[in-house]
């Protein structure tokens, strides 16, 4: 026997370690509740630790290690959604899973806070009224922890309750909240546009039963759930053109983070955050630093990551993705960040780091374009202006953008390249291969720059994984390892070279990828991109003619 200190989420227990207690054998498992702290033996080959109403883990006495539990649950949920008439796409699957997951998570969060308050002799005020809490309407339990199907609604009764009572009630929190960064506001925002698409109350009952099997309490559980959820987002991203708006391949994000190297205490933003992949991966990167203090961990939770997202579904996915990665109340705002005039951005809004992959080929209305000094309908170009503006002096950025930005000859492209080179040190350009973004149909580059000093030299790296990328053969971390290594010293190689600022044409500011080792890279643009540039040039010509006619009157 030996003395041991065992930690559950936000709780601890000092006790004596039983002789049978195996080492490193945690395996996420079903809930077990008890009123008294202590060890508890169960029949057969398993042992369980019970800690005052706190979910721990099944312990496998054989010491074989923990095994994934939730993968099959996610498959079961998708199987039910597949036969549901109201859900026809991968986007529907993720959307419907997300709002139910959020309510399950919210219930666990509130239960944890209530337990903490009780242990401190305080009373916790629940956010949700009792009849709208998960453990009342969705998963009422009997004493053994199983769902009480005598109390749990199903069929038309369940569907009508969700559609006519639950969702309107949750939507109402947006008006009651004290501010946009509160959990109450986020509840209202999520349910202001997200609707229940599950038409069969029996299917809804089955999905709820599966969702209730999932737990968010331990780091192992959150880790597994975050990976499963990311897999769903990836499938959605592979589903077609629209799905690609939500997913940036994670190996590319991780490589970008390794180049920019965000630090504890810095503010990180993504104002086109999609599923919050950049913010989640940045959190993982920074959280895994050794020796973080409690204060630093609190800073990571509350004062580090900020995002904005225009689309309702992406907003919900971003919130849920950050929660599963371990950020309890994400600082994500549901808004079109381009609607803010750049002149209105205050110093206290500026940040140290920007990561982003703004939408390809989007078109913004004239009134939105008025918010920017370089006016263009190209959404990505407006975002790039915003990213430069919101950075502090010395701030760093990693931005994904279409490779045609480097060479387009329209006025907006030329002016924006000039602005970037003069106001920032564009030190690195990563040229990504075709297929990096499935379904997007365009080639991309990643721009790495630091605000405050003009560009002196640009280092290029031409990424070539040596194979055709596709859905079953995507970009991986190993493909990017050489880029990350060489970028530290901006070394020349058959795939990398440097361009002095003095060699950049001062009239076009052309930054095209031209590898001196392999000749100039010919960029074959899609017909759609060519037509878009023709339309842009035509619009510029029409504007000039309009002004000339005005002068002749």
Which functions belong to the PLM regions below?
Residues 9-12, 17-19, 30-34, 38-41:
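Arg/Gly-rich low-complexity intrinsically disordered repeat tracts
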Residues 425-426, 435-438, 443-481:
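C-terminal, active-site-flanking charged/polar segments
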Residues 218, 272, 307-311, 344, ...:
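Hydrophobic alpha-helical scaffolding
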Residues 312, 338-339, 359-362, 403-406, ...:
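Conserved nucleotide-binding/hydrolysis micro-motifs of P-loop NTPases
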Residues 89, 315, 377-448:
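Conserved Class I SAM-dependent methyltransferase catalytic core
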Residues 26, 32, 40, 45-264, ...:
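Non-catalytic, mostly N-terminal accessory regions of nucleic-acid modification and defense proteins
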Residues 243-356, 361-363, 368, 375-377, ...:
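Conserved S-adenosyl-L-methionine
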Residues 2, 18-22:
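Cationic, low-complexity basic patches in intrinsically disordered or flexible, solvent-exposed regions
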């Amino acid at each position: 026997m030996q003395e041991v200190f065992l930690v559950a989420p936000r709780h601890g227990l000092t006790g004596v370690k039983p002789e049978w207690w195996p080492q490193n054998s945690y395996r996420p498992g079903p809930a077990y509740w008890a009123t008294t702290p202590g060890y508890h033996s169960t029949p057969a080959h398993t042992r369980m630790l019970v800690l005052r109403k706190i979910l721990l883990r099944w312990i496998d006495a054989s010491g074989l290690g923990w095994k994934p539990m939730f993968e099959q649950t996610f498959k079961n949920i998708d199987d039910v959604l597949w036969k549901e008439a109201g859900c026809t796409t991968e986007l529907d699957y993720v959307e419907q899973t997300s709002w139910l997951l959020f309510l399950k998570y919210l219930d666990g969060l509130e239960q944890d806070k209530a337990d903490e308050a009780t242990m401190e002799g305080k009373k916790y005020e629940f956010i949700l009224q009792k009849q709208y809490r998960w453990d009342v309407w969705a998963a009422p339990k009997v004493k053994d922890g199983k769902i009480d199907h005598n109390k749990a609604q199903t069929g038309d009764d369940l569907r009508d309750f969700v559609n006519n009572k639950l969702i309107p009630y949750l939507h109402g929190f947006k008006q009651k909240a004290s501010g946009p960064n509160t959990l109450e506001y986020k509840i209202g925002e999520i349910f202001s546009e997200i609707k229940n698409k599950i038409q069969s109350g029996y299917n809804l009952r089955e999905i709820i039963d599966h969702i209730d099997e999932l737990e968010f309490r331990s780091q192992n559980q959150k880790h597994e759930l975050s990976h499963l959820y990311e897999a769903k987002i990836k499938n959605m991203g592979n589903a077609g053109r629209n799905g690609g708006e939500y997913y940036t391949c994670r190996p590319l994000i991780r490589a970008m983070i390794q180049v920019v190297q965000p630090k504890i205490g810095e503010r990180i933003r993504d104002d086109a955050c999609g599923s919050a992949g950049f913010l989640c991966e940045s959190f993982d990167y920074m959280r895994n630093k050794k020796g973080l203090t409690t204060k630093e961990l609190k800073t990571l939770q509350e004062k580090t990551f900020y995002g904005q997202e225009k689309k309702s579904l992406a907003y919900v996915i971003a919130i849920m993705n950050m929660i599963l990665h371990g950020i309890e109340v994400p600082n994500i705002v549901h808004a079109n960040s381009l609607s803010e005039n750049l002149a209105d951005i205050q110093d206290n809004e500026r940040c140290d780091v920007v990561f982003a992959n703004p939408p390809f080929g989007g078109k913004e209305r004239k009134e939105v374009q008025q918010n920017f000094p370089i006016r263009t309908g190209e959404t990505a170009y407006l975002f790039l202006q915003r990213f430069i503006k919101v950075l502090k002096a010395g701030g760093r950025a990693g931005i994904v953008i279409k490779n045609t930005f480097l060479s387009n000859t329209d006025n907006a492209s030329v002016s924006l390249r000039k602005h970037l080179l003069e106001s920032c040190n564009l030190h690195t350009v990563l040229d990504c291969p075709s297929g990096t973004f499935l379904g997007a149909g365009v080639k991309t580059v990643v721009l790495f720059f630091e605000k405050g000093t003009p560009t002196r030299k640009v280092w290029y790296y031409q990424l070539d994984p040596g194979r055709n990328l596709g859905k079953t053969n995507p970009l991986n971390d190993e493909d990017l390892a050489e880029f990350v290594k060489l970028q530290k010293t901006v070394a020349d190689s058959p795939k990398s070279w440097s361009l002095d600022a003095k060699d950049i044409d001062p009239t076009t500011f052309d930054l095209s990828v031209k590898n001196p080792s392999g000749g100039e890279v010919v960029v074959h643009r899609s017909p759609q991109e060519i037509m878009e540039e023709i339309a842009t040039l035509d619009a510029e010509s029409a504007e000039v003619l309009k002004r000339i006619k005005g002068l002749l009157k």
